[in-house]
Structures are given as structure tokens and as C-alpha cells.
Amino acid sequence: LPASVDWRKEGAVLPIRHQGQCG
């Protein structure tokens, strides 16, 4: 995710598995 986007805020609405793929 772009540094301009707070992953903590976006993570609240995005599926956890999405974070797993990116992180």
C-alpha cells in the first residue's frame, strides 16, 4: 500500500488475507 495511506485505517475495512498477501 502507498505510504500516503494508513494501513491501520485501511486494514480495518480490507480483508485480513489481503494484508497477508501484501505483507
From Swiss-Prot:
Gene3D superfamilies (alphabetical): Cysteine proteinases
Family: Belongs to the peptidase C1 family.
One Gene Ontology molecular-function label: cysteine-type peptidase activity
One record GO biological process: proteolysis
Taxonomic superkingdom: Eukaryota
Role, per record: Thiol protease.
Family matches, as Pfam families: Peptidase_C1
Key words, A-Z: Disulfide bond, Hydrolase, Protease, Signal, Thiol protease
UniProt subunit comment: Monomer.
Protein name, as recorded: Philibertain g 1
Protein source organism: Philibertia gilliesii (Milkweed)
UniProt pH dependence: Optimum pH for casein is 7.6 and philibertain g 1 retains more than 80% of maximum activity between pH 6.7 and pH 8.7, and 50% of maximum activity between pH 6.1 and pH 9.8. Optimum pH for PFLNA is 6.2-7.2 and philibertain g I retains more than 80% of maximum activity between pH 5.8 and pH 7.8, and 50% of maximum activity between pH 5.2 and pH 8.6.
Control of this protein's activity: Strongly inhibited by the cysteine protease inhibitor E64 (L-trans-epoxysuccinyl-leucylamide-(4-guanido)-butane). Not inhibited by the serine protease inhibitor PMSF, the aspartic protease inhibitor pepstatin A, or by the metal ion chelator 1,10-phenanthroline.
E.C. number: 3.4.22.-
